[in-house]
Design a protein with these regions (language model features):
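His/Glu-based metal-binding/catalytic segments typifying zinc-dependent metallopeptidases
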Residues: 1-32
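Conserved catalytic core of Hanks-type protein kinase domains
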Residues: 25, 127, 159
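M16 family metallopeptidases and their MPP-like homologs
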Residues: 1-10, 36-146, 162-171, 178-195
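PPIase-associated folding chaperone regions across multiple families
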Residues: 14-22, 144, 148-151, 156, ...
């Protein structure tokens, strides 16, 4: 399962810090994220599920996406759960508690990553290419630290448009149907009516 949404923004866009932290809460934080809690822990539909956000440094090219590993017979249930969590985020937003916990996790992960020589070398190369220094990284972190739930919710509603998300599902669906027929179990329920077809 792979979902992708292209966004016209760079990593210097004013909305980018909020998009990054909003994604951390939705699916970037792995086990503590909303997608992992719902799809992996609650419903047991995927062992590996998450989301990501990115923005290029040179151009207004960015995006948001999500992924999940699943058994073919669970495809429709997984997509339905994914769409429900997306709708819940857009309608209800994130809480202050979720935002503060996401900040701590995101900053801690950054500290761990910066202890790796390969990461530092890559960043130095990027900074030379885009005429930046580590002061840029510090400023970005400070922007993330200053974010409120209201700011993040506004940015997520602005950029994450369900109808514009492309979804790709791959798997042995015919094999799953034959297996279900042989066992006498009904096929997986289809996605909820009214959801966009991809």
């Amino acid at each position: 399962f792979f979902a992708q949404l292209k966004l016209p923004l760079s990593d210097a866009d004013p909305d980018y810090p909020a998009l990054v932290l909003g994604n951390e809460i939705l699916g970037g934080g792995f086990l503590n994220s909303r997608l992992a809690t719902r799809i992996r822990q609650k419903e047991g539909l995927s062992y590996g599920v998450g989301s990501f956000a990115y923005g290029q440094s040179a151009d207004q090219i960015g995006g948001w996406g999500a992924y999940a590993i699943y058994a073919p017979e669970n495809a429709a249930r997984l997509e339905a759960a994914f769409r429900e969590e997306l709708d819940k985020m857009l309608k209800e937003g994130f809480t202050d508690k979720e935002v503060e916990e996401a900040k701590k996790g995101w900053l801690q992960n950054n500290n761990v990553t910066r202890a790796q020589d390969g990461f530092i070398a890559g960043k130095l190369e990027d900074h030379l290419t885009y005429n930046r220094t580590f002061k840029w990284e510090e400023d970005f972190e400070n922007k993330v630290k200053a974010l409120t739930a209201a700011q993040i919710n506004a940015v997520m509603k602005k950029h994450i448009v369900p109808g514009k998300i492309s979804i790709v599902k791959a798997g042995d669906f015919e094999g799953a149907k034959k297996k279900a027929a042989a066992s006498g179990k009904p096929d997986d329920k289809p996605a909820a009516a009214g959801t966009p077809k991809n």
